[in-house]
Regions:
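Single conserved hydrophobic/aromatic residue that forms the stacking wall/gate
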Residues: 227-234
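A short, structured active-site edge motif that brings together acidic residues
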Residues: 59-70
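Catalytic domains of carbohydrate-active enzymes, especially glycoside hydrolases
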Residues: 28-31
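Structural detector of well-ordered beta-strand residues that form the stable sheet scaffold
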Residues: 36, 59-61, 138, 160-162, ...
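Divalent metal-binding pocket/active-site signature
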Residues: 2-4, 9-22, 34-44, 50, ...
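His/Asp/Glu-enriched short active-site or ligand-binding loop at hydrolase and phosphoryl-transfer sites
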Residues: 178-192
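Non-cysteine beta-strand/loop elements that form the S-adenosyl-L-methionine
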Residues: 61-63, 101-106, 206-213
């Protein structure tokens, strides 16, 4: 398989520190023509941009992930002490870099004990930023469909709902609104019947591939090899 675009990845993760250059070369040699490299807070934005500047097929997305509200080593907590508004304001000039083509990874996560209202306000602020900059979004939605869909209906952003886990019914209106749906390693799991149903009914151009590396691998591939699995997922 050639001409692959990985629509959601984290190659700037520390897990790639030992062999990042080799991994990136392997991607280019393996038919990957594009990668959307996603930041999760201001602390990893520089590493994301460095990758995008070094490798022509890597494009950057900058944003504050909802989990960064509760991670002690994330800049949102470690540097800004939870003041995501100040952090987002400090990140604003970075969006002038032509390597930045999206706002992400942003969204809502109700799986972990994170402040719900702060998440909502942070996500809404970043949807507004994407609207202001006329950029697409890379969206994280974990166990937060109701609030997520409320804001997506309101702001109608372009972009990808990463690691889509919703129903076929919701997929219909999301794609009609112009959102693409991201599918990665989870579609290979034994319980992924809902994903199969969604994939059978959405337009092919709005069902996109992602690795979310190094965090999600298809069965039976070890997580450490997630970056090599796009053909397997497809």
């Amino acid at each position: 398989m050639t001409n692959i675009f990985d629509t959601h990845a984290h190659y700037s993760s520390r897990q790639f520190d030992a062999d990042r250059d080799a991994v990136m070369r392997a991607l280019g040699e393996g038919g990957v023509v594009g990668v959307l490299e996603c930041a999760t807070h201001s602390g990893d934005a520089a590493a994301v941009l460095e990758l995008a500047h070094k490798y022509p097929f890597v494009h950057a997305a900058l944003g504050i992930h909802p989990e960064s509200l509760g991670e002690e080593d994330a800049a949102t907590v470690a540097t800004y002490h939870g003041d995501w508004r100040a952090e987002l304001a400090a990140m604003r000039p970075l969006f002038d870099d032509p390597a930045v083509i999206a706002v992400g990874e942003i969204g809502l996560d109700h799986h972990w004990p994170l402040p719900a209202q702060e998440q909502y306000d942070l996500f809404e602020a970043q949807l507004q930023l994407a609207q202001e900059l006329d950029l697409p979004v890379s969206v994280h939605d974990r166990e937060a469909h109701a609030e997520m869909y409320e804001l997506l209906r309101q702001y109608r952003p372009r972009g990808v709902l990463h690691c889509y886990s919703g129903s076929a019914e919701d997929a219909a209106w999301l794609t009609a609104q112009g959102m693409a749906l991201g599918f990665g390693g989870a579609v290979t799991y034994k319980g992924a019947k809902r994903a199969a149903k969604v994939l059978a009914m959405v337009p092919h151009e709005l069902a996109v591939l992602e690795t979310d590396c190094p965090y999600m691998s298809p069965e039976p591939v070890p997580v450490s090899y997630t970056h090599l699995t796009l053909p397997t997922i497809a």
